[in-house]
Amino acid sequence: MPFLDIQKRFGLNIDRWLTIQSGEQPYKMAGRCHAFEKEWIECAHGIGYTRAEKECKIEYDDFVECLLRQKTMRRAGTIRKQRDKLIKEGKYTPPPHHIGKGEPRP
């Protein structure tokens, strides 16, 4: 037990906010992946861990992708590599404002 329990003193429950986005949030703002987490929890509730691993895999994978965005970042990297390849071959010229030669803004 910490010497000064600041969370309890101020009536905060940061641990719950970080672990379950579906729980009550500060300022009543839903988390980014709230919908995916809610679907996963509703699917897995009451069926047990072993069955939930198999039956709720799609919901869990969607939730993890929303949190970590691994597929999105991989796709952005692939697009960037393709763009660089096209620039190198001379088939694509980026607009001037993308390469820092645009008009200066006030």
From Swiss-Prot:
It comes from the Eukaryota. It is a peripheral membrane protein. It holds the Pfam family Ndufs5. One of its GO terms (cellular component) is respiratory chain complex I. Disulfide bonds join 33-66, 43-56. Keywords: Disulfide bond, Electron transport, Membrane, Mitochondrion, Mitochondrion inner membrane, Respiratory chain, Transport. It is found in: Mitochondrion inner membrane; Mitochondrion intermembrane space. InterPro entries: NADH_UbQ_OxRdtase_FeS-su5. Residues 84-106 are annotated as: Disordered. Belongs to the complex I NDUFS5 subunit family. Mammalian complex I is composed of 45 different subunits. This is a component of the iron-sulfur (IP) fragment of the enzyme. Accessory subunit of the mitochondrial membrane respiratory chain NADH dehydrogenase (Complex I), that is believed not to be involved in catalysis. Complex I functions in the transfer of electrons from NADH to the respiratory chain. The immediate electron acceptor for the enzyme is believed to be ubiquinone. Contains two C-X9-C motifs that are predicted to form a helix-coil-helix structure, permitting the formation of intramolecular disulfide bonds. This is NADH dehydrogenase [ubiquinone] iron-sulfur protein 5. It comes from Homo sapiens. The gene is NDUFS5.
